[in-house]
């Protein structure tokens, strides 16, 4: 399998996007030859070497961030500490939490984030996460070889290059 203008779809997309696809396909060939496999759209590892930190985000986990500028996501609350170390330390010394930003994630936002981040993973998402209105879109992408669907919906190797557009199609149809 060699990356080429034909495999990148030069005839159907602009040259810039085709060149990006060629770059990604060339990288994929080199990484696969070295024993790496993709586990997220733009992340590769040898078996067992996946980044647990990033998987937490993509799998809808929760986390506490410590230190200046650190971000946290607990329950449905997303917040970030103040960025400047001096202000962070002064706030703590004053007995307050150094939170510089906070937001509550709505059910709809949470759902969209689960689909968006989960479909970036090779393991995909539970089929139940996709609304009934988007089933036709999923079926279209399965027929096009970009998704697999069963108990889980996941991008294929070919779909990996188009994951953002696939997610947009699915969420727009729900």
Q: What do these predicted ranges mean?
A:
Residues 1-131:
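C-terminal scaffold of the Radical SAM
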Residues 142-152:
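A short, conserved structural fragment
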Residues 63, 153-154:
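Hydrophobic residues embedded in beta-strands of well-ordered beta-sheets
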Residues 129-144:
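Short amphipathic alpha-helical interaction segments
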Residues 158-174:
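Short, amphipathic alpha-helical interaction segments positioned at domain boundaries
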